[in-house]
């Protein structure tokens, strides 16, 4: 079976930490796949908030996630603090890619938990149409 392989781009645009909650733990006593999706969403929201943006106002555009891929590497457990590095990938007129490297430290060991990618589309809900990435948002993605 072919596996997803995510190569992280070079443009690092943020670092976020998210602690693992007991609600993130599944019947296997580790973080569930659905919780990883929520952690990635939380990281994106915190990254936007660093610049006073939200998914409803990214320098004037709303954001819609068009796709998501996750490459799981190791289990994560209650008590882990997940360090998420956010990277900017390919940018088009109306959309861009965000990549995420999720890791934690246990003892003195750095552990790669997962890599992920989301496709984000700029959207205007009033006209129900995609719109160009605002200039201020482009500057943030290209820093």
Please give the residue ranges for each predicted region:
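Hot-dog-fold acyl-thioester-processing enzymes
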Residues: 2-67, 123-143
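Helix-adjacent hinge/juxtasegments
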Residues: 61-62, 66-87
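HotDog/MaoC-like acyl-thioester-processing domains
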Residues: 1-15, 72, 76-78, 89-143
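A generic structural signal for ordered secondary structure
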Residues: 20-22, 84-86, 116
